[in-house]
Amino acid sequence: MIEPDLETVEPDLAPVGPDLEIEVEQRLLAVFDFDGTITRHDSFVPFLKFAFGQRAFSVRMARLVLPSLGYLAKRLTRDELKGRLIKAFLSGVEVQWLQQKAEAFCQSHWKRLMRPAALESIAAEIEKGAIVTLCSASPAMVLQPFADRLKVQLIGTNLEVIDGKLTGLIEGSNCRCDSKVARLESVYGPLSQFRVRAWGDTRGDHELLAAAQDAHWRLFHPTWRRGRYKGPVNAKLHNPDGNDGPTR
C-alpha cells in the first residue's frame, strides 16, 4: 500500500488537528434550572399547599412568620430559611407519600406551571443529542416526575431519609450557587469535557451560567420581565440585557 504524501494532500483532506479533535469529541451538556426558568413561578411552595391542603398549609406557614422576618432582617440566610420550611412540613413524612403527591402535583399542575418555549428548547436539546439535565434547588423527590415526563436527568436538593421517612433535614447542601456546579461535576465529571449550555433566572444560577460556554438569562420570560443580568462578567451570555443578543 502506497502511503500518501501529507504535504500534497488537499487542505480539506488534511488530518484533523488536535484542537479540532477535542471540539468534535466534546459532548453537549444542556443544564436547565427549574423554578422560574422553565416554569412560570416557584413550584415548591405551591406543591406543599397542594400536598397538605389549605388548612394544614396555613398552620405550618404561620410557624414560619418569625423565621421569615429573621431572613428579611438578614439574621437568617436563604438556605437556613429553606431548612426551616422543609423541617416544618416534611419532618416524619413517609417517602412513598411524598412521591405519590409529587406525581399527582406534576399531572395536575403541568400545563399551568411549565413555559411552552422552555419545553420546546428542552426537546430541541434532546434532538441534538445533548445530555439534558434539570439542576434545581428544589427537592429532587418533588421534581422527579417532571424530569421523568421530560425524559431528562435530574440534580436537585436531596432530603435525608431514615427508615423510609424524611427527617426534615437536607442531605448535603442546598443545590444552588457553587453547589450547582459541584453537583454537576460529581455526576458528570469535569465540565471541561463538555460544551455546556445553561439556562437560569436568579442569583442561584450565576455560577452555573459562568461555567457554561453558552449561557441564557431568563430566556423564556416575557421580555419586559427579564431584566439585566448582574452576575459574573465572565459568563458567556447570549442575552445579558434580557434580550436575544449576540454572545458577549
Across the structure, where does each feature detected by a protein language model lie?
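C-terminal cap/substrate-recognition subdomain and adjoining C-terminal extension
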Residues: 1-15, 19, 26-27, 100, ...
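Active-site neighborhood of HAD-like aspartate-dependent phosphohydrolases
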Residues: 17-74
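Residues at alpha-helix boundaries and short interhelical turns
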Residues: 38, 55, 76, 92, ...
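Conserved active-site and cofactor/substrate-binding residues in soluble primary-metabolism enzymes
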Residues: 42, 93, 179
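A general structural signal for well-ordered alpha-helical segments in protein cores
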Residues: 44-45, 82, 181
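Residues within well-ordered alpha-helical secondary structure of globular protein domains
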Residues: 50-53, 104, 214
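Short, compositionally biased "basic patch" segments
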Residues: 69-95, 147-150, 154-158
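Metal-dependent phosphoesterase signature
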Residues: 81-116
